């Protein structure tokens, strides 16, 4: 890639640790003799030509910052052939020979289609708090979000206990229950409602009631968000419990975008640094159109089609763990 640039962008929802990944990609690239161009506002910015060369100074003192210095956006235009054609013209104009994309399944889907249509080498880094990309144990931003949820639930437990209340706490995750399941275990919640293991209201009352009948004077139920309430979010389940078991004092707390912000955890900084450096190594090895992941603490290359098409399974044994420990 003599006299060529590596382009880097962040796309979709932001996740803490993206800046650490930008830093790692930029510094590893420069260390190995490449130049880097940052693309602002994701694919939308690529189409608009919002491109700037990055130096080591540009990425100094960003490892500890949440969000992304390159900004991010969702792009409807890039989903069209016309939009991708405009993006490719910018790639040619800016002399970019390889593109590194940090984002979730939608971002990597865009990268896969772009790579198939044009002769552009694309490397993906898993950046999403949902932790739902197949082929990697962890995604950038997941650990920070998990810690944020646990911190919030700890505070909610204080007020729930003071008032003998049940709180339904809604967290992000879309179609994946990693955040809800693991934050429930880490915070000592009574139950988790996740897409992979839907709980009905009577089961829920069993989990809640057995605690109140013993020594507990509060209950926490962590619920994965449900887009458009197709399967019921925290409000849906809270309303059902209020209606069918009116003796309980029920409240709802939706954590929302709190989960995306804040300084990245040490684990996310290390993960992002490893994945970012590995992306440059992958390019030097001639890899293309793969996501860089981590499995059993080892770097792996996952073809885009696997990362975005396969469902990442949740550890069902954790459902048993939560059930046994919530008595």
UniProtKB/Swiss-Prot annotation:
Q: Where does ADP bind?
A: 23-27, 157, 188-190, 214, 216-218
Q: In which pathway does it act?
A: Carbohydrate degradation; glycolysis; D-glyceraldehyde 3-phosphate and glycerone phosphate from D-glucose: step 3/4
Which residues are involved in binding substrate?
128-130, 165, 172-174, 225, 251, 257-260
Gene Ontology CC terms: 6-phosphofructokinase complex
Residue positions annotated to bind ATP are 13, 74-75, 104-107
Which Gene3D superfamilies does the UniProt record give? 3.40.50.450, Phosphofructokinase domain
Record-given protein name = ATP-dependent 6-phosphofructokinase 1
Alphabetical list of SUPFAM superfamilies matching this protein: Phosphofructokinase
> Which cofactors are named for this entry?
Mg(2+)
According to its UniProt record, where is this protein mainly located? cytoplasm
Q: Which organism is it from?
A: Bacteroides thetaiotaomicron (strain ATCC 29148 / DSM 2079 / JCM 5827 / CCUG 10774 / NCTC 10582 / VPI-5482 / E50)
